[in-house]
């Protein structure tokens, strides 16, 4: 309807079941976030696209690199000024070394179920297509997720928060695994299918396997001068940190610690919270629980204290999930 704000979401969870890289809680994260979007923020179920790699998923909706990028492109194409776009990702992250030069610099990427990496450059190009006046909020509970929108302004990172971020003594009764795939593991996995020697850069493997569907980072792309935009990244950790995937005694309670912190913060504060508050309160909760990862916020100055997902009022009632 003309004049009515659209609320659109794409939610992705990759557990990589049956592989050496299997995680436990990524699909649970997605299901919990879907319920929260509907109950708290008023998203219509039909406007939420869910891509997971469990047995219930048809090939057409598996979270491959191409399918994720297609879903995000379709969401942005539907958007108009004033709309609220949301992307949630739970799964492995990795760091990709530059192909030439730049010393030891590495860039951030997420790892879809087919290992067709989606990089910070892809997310930058996506955000650049968001209509002016719309917002694109991204929550990524993956390792090295800080900086996943290339050139987005740092607002809350470790050096900008004055708090006692010392390691907390103590243990948890639940097993935690990092949502991180080393670069060598990514190349090793791809080389078996690409036919390219494992000594080559990951770009050679991805271009051989996926062609035009490979990340723009590995093809020619322009690097525009950054300017304020509607991109908002809430990362599960800093770019040099890992994000924890926690296996609970009850399998239904498996999940990512960063996602769990966001859910807990939202549940404890039904009234609108700013992007800054969601990240800061999530950091404090993880610190209290003894997890050494630091969620971060990247966005324009105007969006730091804007309401998370543009929530304007407290929901009348949040049904039990």
Named regions from a protein language model:
Residues 1-105, 230-231, 247-256, 299-321:
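Boundary/activation segment at the start of structured domains
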Residues 6, 61-90, 94-157, 167-174, ...:
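Caspase-like (clan CD) cysteine peptidase catalytic core
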Residues 16, 27-28, 108-157, 194-220, ...:
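Catalytic cores of nucleophile-dependent amide-cleaving enzymes
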Residues 18, 40-44, 55-58, 75-79, ...:
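Generic recognition of well-structured, leucine-rich alpha-helical segments
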Residues 28, 257, 273, 277:
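Conserved active-site and cofactor/substrate-binding residues in soluble primary-metabolism enzymes
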Residues 255-267:
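Short, small-residue alpha-helix embedded
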């Amino acid at each position: 309807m003309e004049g009515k704000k659209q609320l659109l979401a794409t939610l992705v969870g990759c557990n990589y079941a049956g592989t050496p890289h299997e995680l436990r809680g990524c699909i649970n994260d997605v299901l919990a976030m879907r319920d929260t979007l509907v109950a708290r923020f008023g998203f219509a179920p039909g406007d939420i696209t869910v891509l997971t790699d469990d047995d219930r998923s048809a090939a057409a909706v598996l979270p491959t690199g191409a399918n994720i990028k297609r879903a995000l492109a379709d969401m942005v194409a539907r958007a108009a000024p004033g709309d609220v776009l949301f992307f949630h990702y739970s799964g492995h992250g990795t760091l990709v070394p530059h192909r030439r030069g730049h010393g030891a610099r590495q860039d951030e990427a997420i790892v879809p179920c087919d290992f067709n990496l989606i990089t910070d450059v892809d997310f930058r190009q996506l955000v650049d297509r968001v209509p002016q006046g719309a917002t694109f909020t991204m929550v990524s509970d993956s390792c090295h997720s800080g900086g996943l929108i290339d050139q987005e302004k740092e607002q809350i990172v470790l050096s900008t928060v004055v708090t006692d971020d010392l390691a907390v003594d103590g243990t948890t009764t639940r097993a935690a695994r990092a949502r991180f795939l080393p670069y060598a593991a990514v190349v090793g996995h791809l080389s078996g299918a690409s036919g390219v020697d494992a000594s080559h850069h990951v770009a050679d493997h991805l271009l051989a396997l996926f062609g035009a569907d490979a990340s723009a980072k590995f093809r020619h792309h322009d690097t525009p001068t950054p300017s304020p935009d509607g991109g908002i990244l809430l990362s599960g950790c800093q770019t040099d940190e890992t994000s924890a995937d926690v296996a609970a005694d009850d399998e239904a309670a498996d999940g990512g610690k960063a996602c769990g912190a966001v859910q807990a913060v939202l549940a404890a504060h039904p009234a609108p919270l700013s992007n800054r508050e969601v990240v800061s309160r999530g950091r404090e909760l993880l610190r209290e629980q003894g997890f050494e990862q630091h969620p971060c916020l990247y966005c324009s100055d105007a969006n730091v204290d804007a309401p998370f997902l543009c929530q304007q009022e407290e929901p009348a009632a949040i049904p039990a999930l």
